[in-house]
């Protein structure tokens, strides 16, 4: 019998019941909750007069609607304020731990989970948010769920799911200078497309993946959803264990030793068979920039905007034509000639300490270009912000003309005060460049933190390797 993939090991460890058609009731170890997808779920509990099955397995934090500027006056927008106040009230009523807006541990849910040791290897992790796949970086099975499923997990600590197919994305070799996990993610999506991972759980492996920090692995797994995958994951190794050790919610003493012994088994067996294998050469990956309105519309910084006539199908050709029209770009324009109005460094993809260090290294001693109206850096959590300030990164950004903000989802999505105006063009370290994602009529280009910082200082895209 062939060995098991990491996905199969994680899945099998959480099976409660299997229906004849394969639909499986899975046990959920960790439930992350935020203010946008939880109000209806809590309301459902109240109407049914149910209590959460395991309030200790849930943790809540407001992130989507919180202001990233001065918080002393609270939240100005009444709808956003109501959502956060509702989360506060629901968590208090049902006994769920919440890192409120005035708590230094508050931040983006997919940053605070790993940071606090709430995300551990071998866990099933869910959240009412697409980018829950981030937590798979720890050798966990993590995926986003809908609001009705949020209620189901609160009530039963279980969830009905169908098993995914398995894909191995193998990146061998060594990344070049200035090339990051974000570039790997965009290169993978450019290769397989935004539907390439549909129906799959993607495991990232190979020498280049093993060489990544946990921050890099989180970036990669965060973007797995943009390839259409249900989940992304990386096998546990010493890098994983070293990151988790000593975190507030991590096990200690004998429990730690027992956990580590199991965690070390969380990798695909040598003879495991995947449904699909995709291979990339790390040395061939260059800094990536998206040019269109889907993460698969991506090219290298040294290339030009493609011509729709080169699209692989008529459907794609029409998509490219529409994208270029929306983005206000002409085919053949060098990527390096694309000028910018705003730059956003943040989001659950790229707002961790390593991301901020990479951006600060580029910004140091430079100034934001005059044509860039706003360049902002939004740390992923209060603790990331605290650490960055202890390292002097905030001064580097402020001296260069960047705004240094409070933690939150910010300009990743047009759900708070940070957004693009119609026609504004932004270099963003977030994960989605859909039409209107950062604001109605806003034009988003996805890049790494270092590329975003370089673009802010140059006023247009530049190859960070030569900057």
From Swiss-Prot:
One of its GO terms (biological process) is L-leucine biosynthetic process. It catalyses: (2R,3S)-3-isopropylmalate = (2S)-2-isopropylmalate. Its cofactor is [4Fe-4S] cluster. The keyword 4Fe-4S applies. It comes from the Bacteria. Transmembrane segments: none annotated. [4Fe-4S] cluster binds at residues 348, 409, 412. Catalyzes the isomerization between 2-isopropylmalate and 3-isopropylmalate, via the formation of 2-isopropylmaleate. This is 3-isopropylmalate dehydratase large subunit. It comes from Thiobacillus denitrificans (strain ATCC 25259 / T1).
């Amino acid at each position: 019998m062939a060995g098991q993939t990491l996905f199969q090991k994680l899945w099998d460890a959480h099976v409660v019941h299997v229906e004849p058609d394969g639909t499986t009731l899975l046990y959920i170890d960790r439930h992350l909750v935020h203010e946008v997808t939880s109000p209806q779920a809590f309301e459902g509990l109240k109407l049914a007069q149910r209590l959460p099955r395991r309030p200790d397995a849930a943790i809540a934090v407001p992130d989507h609607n919180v202001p990233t500027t001065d918080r002393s006056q609270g939240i100005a927008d009444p709808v956003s304020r109501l959502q956060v106040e509702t989360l506060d009230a629901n968590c208090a009523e049902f006994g769920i731990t919440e890192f409120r807006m005035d708590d230094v541990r508050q931040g983006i849910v997919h940053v605070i989970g790993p940071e606090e040791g709430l995300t551990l290897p071998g866990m099933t992790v869910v959240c009412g948010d697409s980018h829950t796949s981030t937590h798979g970086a720890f050798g966990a099975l993590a995926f986003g769920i809908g609001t009705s499923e949020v209620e189901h997990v609160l009530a039963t600590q279980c969830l009905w799911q169908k098993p995914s197919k398995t894909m191995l994305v193998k990146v061998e070799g060594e990344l070049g200078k200035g090339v990051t996990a974000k570039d790997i993610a965009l290169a993978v999506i450019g290769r397989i497309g935004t539907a390439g991972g549909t129906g799959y759980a993607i495991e990232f492996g190979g020498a280049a993946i093993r060489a990544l920090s946990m921050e890099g692995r989180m970036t990669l797994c965060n973007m797995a959803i943009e390839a259409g995958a249900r989940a992304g994951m990386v096998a546990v190794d010493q890098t994983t264990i070293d990151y988790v050790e000593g975190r507030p919610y991590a096990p200690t003493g004998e429990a730690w030793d027992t956990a580590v012994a199991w965690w070390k088994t969380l990798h695909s067996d040598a003879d495991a068979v995947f449904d699909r294998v995709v291979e990339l050469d790390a040395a061939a990956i260059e800094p990536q920039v998206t040019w269109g309105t889907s993460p698969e519309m991506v090219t290298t910084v040294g290339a030009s905007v493609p011509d729709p006539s080169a699209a692989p199908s008529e459907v794609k050709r029409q998509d490219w034509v529409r994208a270029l029209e929306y983005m206000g770009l002409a085919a053949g324009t060098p990527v390096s000639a694309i000028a910018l109005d705003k730059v956003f460094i943040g989001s659950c993809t790229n707002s961790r300490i390593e991301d901020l260090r990479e951006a600060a290294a580029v910004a140091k001693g430079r100034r934001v270009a005059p044509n860039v109206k706003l360049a902002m850096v939004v740390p992923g959590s209060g603790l990331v912000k605290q650490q960055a300030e202890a390292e002097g990164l905030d001064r580097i950004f402020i001296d260069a003309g960047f705004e240094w903000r409070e933690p939150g989802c910010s300009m990743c999505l047009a759900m708070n005060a940070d957004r693009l105006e119609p026609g504004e063009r932004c270099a963003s370290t977030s994960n989605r460049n859909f039409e209107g994602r950062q604001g109605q009529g806003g034009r988003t280009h996805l890049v790494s933190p270092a590329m975003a910082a370089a673009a802010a200082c140059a006023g247009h895209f530049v190859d960070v390797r030569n900057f």
